[in-house]
């Protein structure tokens, strides 16, 4: 087995892994801060997070559908089409970001009522989700821009942006809650500011990268919309299924008690952290796989065999860790 395959997978995977893990890890910090305010507040975060996630995470195709297309275009040195794809992706970000903001902002009371929480939890959920809703467009911008950079083999930018978001979020969490006494409003606002600064960083990095594209590079006509959505359709269905499953579980928990909502909220993030371990390999390998497919050398290649072995090993590892240490992780 060619060790260079494992090296390429590692180089592309570790920034993505730590970036993906940081998001649920920071959400656990949000939950910790919320738990200091009270169980009802923590339950409110759980309900608000479910609504936000159901409407925003469905657009993960903006990331997963972008990376392989950018990678294949880069392999063909078709940077003119890469620029067109960036512009098209940003239009989608602005549209879906604005739409999501309006839906949550206008219909937040109705969306919260679907979980049938007690009055206090419903109020806390609204207090949390309204300021966080302003960060929707920044979050989607991060998804798209980081995906473009991964396709350009700049995966380290994904990790750097995640670190920026995590640090800003945690710092503002404690400042807004424990210094300015903003409560759940402060936690939601901290998240929005974190996404804003992270989006600014990625915008600057991508702008510098695009400035290196020369006018002499190849540029061919391709239907950007058709190519993008052909890659994104299956990913969109996967996202809808996963988000729907998690939202349904949270909805069932909300019908039992505030304690059940809080426990479900924590368990889902523990699950997310470990699943991200495997997902990071899938996300990072999109670049490598796309490059191989362009040259018609992926199927039955050492790379494909390496990816199958790595994912199988990680699946077994996650299963054993969760089976043995789940109670300790939750406590």
Predicted feature residues:
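Short membrane-interface helical motifs at transmembrane helix boundaries
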Residues: 99-130, 317-331
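Membrane-interface helix-loop junctions in multi-pass transport and translocation proteins
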Residues: 156, 166-199, 324-328
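Residue-level recognition of transmembrane alpha-helices
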Residues: 13, 20, 46-49, 93, ...
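Alpha-helical transmembrane segments of multi-pass membrane proteins
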Residues: 119-142, 270-274
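Small-residue-rich hydrophobic transmembrane alpha-helices
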Residues: 42-102, 139-153, 157, 261-322, ...
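Signature of the first transmembrane helix
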Residues: 7-67, 230-255
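Helix-terminus/linker motif at the lipid-water interface of multi-pass membrane proteins
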Residues: 25-44, 112-119, 175-182, 240-273, ...
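Interhelical loop/hinge segments that connect adjacent transmembrane helices in multipass membrane
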Residues: 1-13, 188-191, 200-243
């Amino acid at each position: 087995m060619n060790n260079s395959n494992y090296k390429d997978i590692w180089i592309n995977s570790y920034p993505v892994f730590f970036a993906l893990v940081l998001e649920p890890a920071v959400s656990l910090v949000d939950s910790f801060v919320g738990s200091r305010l009270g169980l009802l507040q923590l339950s409110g975060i759980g309900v608000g997070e479910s609504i936000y996630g159901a409407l925003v995470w469905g657009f993960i195709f903006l990331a997963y559908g972008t990376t392989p297309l950018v990678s294949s275009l880069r392999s063909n040195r078709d940077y003119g089409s890469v620029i067109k794809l960036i512009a098209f992706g940003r239009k989608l970000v602005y549209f879906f970001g604005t739409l999501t903001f309006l839906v949550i902002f206008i219909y937040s009371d109705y969306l919260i009522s679907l979980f049938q929480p007690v009055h206090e939890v419903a109020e806390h959920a609204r207090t949390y989700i309204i300021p966080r809703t302003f960060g929707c467009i920044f979050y989607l911008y991060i998804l798209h821009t980081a995906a473009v950079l991964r396709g350009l083999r700049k995966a380290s930018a994904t990790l750097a942006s995640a670190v920026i978001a995590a640090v800003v979020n945690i710092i503002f969490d404690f400042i807004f809650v424990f210094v300015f006494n903003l409560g759940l409003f402060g936690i939601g606002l901290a998240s929005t500011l974190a996404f804003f600064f992270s989006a600014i960083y990625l915008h600057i990095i991508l702008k510098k990268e695009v400035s290196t594209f020369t006018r002499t590079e190849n540029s061919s006509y391709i239907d950007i919309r058709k190519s993008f959505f052909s890659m994104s359709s299956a990913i969109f269905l996967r996202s809808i299924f996963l988000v729907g499953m998690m939202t349904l579980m949270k909805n069932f928990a909300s019908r039992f008690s505030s304690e059940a909502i809080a426990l479900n909220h924590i368990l889902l993030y523990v699950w997310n952290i470990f699943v991200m371990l495997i997902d990071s390999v899938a996300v990072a390998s999109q670049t490598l796989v796309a490059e191989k497919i362009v040259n018609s050398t992926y199927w039955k290649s050492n790379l494909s065999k390496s990816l199958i072995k790595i994912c199988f090993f990680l699946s077994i590892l996650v299963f054993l860790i969760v089976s043995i240490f789940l109670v300790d992780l939750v406590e």
